């Protein structure tokens, strides 16, 4: 089995069975407080929560964010996630496909995932560091073709790699490779972080490189410094990982920086979004979709029904936030008054 697959198993164990969240840093949504509207002038049951992203219509503005792409026992989790995404009418991004390209038997990603995610967008996923490989363009297209993806996530995770044993430490030329890949791949390309956030400055570089969308994947949820520290055997790196446990830009700050510069850029908010009220705040700050990974993972270990129940609760809370602000739809929510 590939070493990357072993590491993914450790990641899964860390997130499921240990506290890997940031200690004191939040996603920043507590700074957004809606003004209550006592005359909403809309029907609670008719509030429209539908959304559109990269040409696909969704029943709800939710994304099952990338996770469990390489663990050998993860296929059942991914199948449940795909089934739930189809039932709820939401998008799904798979975890890193680096392992599936090297060892398809232990990838956690069967080709049936496309059949299970019926009628909803499915997003492929590769690490930006792998774009430095000689076969990078072929690998990217293979990743897309392997699951018949509707778009390709490329994840930026330099700090995570820095804490990994045998991680990819040379990031010179990554931006140029992103620009070149955009010209070669035949689906939209979304750039995401993994929980440290994308700043307005980096977003500008990515937009100029031609990317189609950005997932800010900000700080406030799972700390990948902590996760990699858990996987480390080197004492110095373990201590450093704990020191950097709260490193990153809060998700709300990322949204404010990027949406202020690019009013029309498709944006995903993920990182420390735990409930429908926080999802409403993310939409208010400019997110077109709201992604969750760790918050969904425990439900995914139980059943498809548990995942569906999770997103039904999220949808109820989002609907309540819309109604409480007098917002008949998500577009109106972006203009809701704040205290």
From Swiss-Prot:
Residues bound to substrate: 7-8, 96-98, 160
Enzyme class: isomerase
One Gene Ontology molecular-function label: FMN binding
Name of the gene: fni
SUPFAM superfamilies: FMN-linked oxidoreductases
InterPro entries cross-referenced by the UniProt entry: Aldolase_TIM, FMN-dep_DH, IPdP_isomerase
Binding residues annotated for FMN, in chain numbering: 65-68, 96, 125, 192, 222, 293-294
Lineage: Bacteria, Pseudomonadati, Pseudomonadota, Gammaproteobacteria, Vibrionales
Family: Belongs to the IPP isomerase type 2 family.
Name of the molecule in the record: Isopentenyl-diphosphate delta-isomerase
Localization of this protein: Cytoplasm
Organism: Vibrio campbellii (strain ATCC BAA-1116)
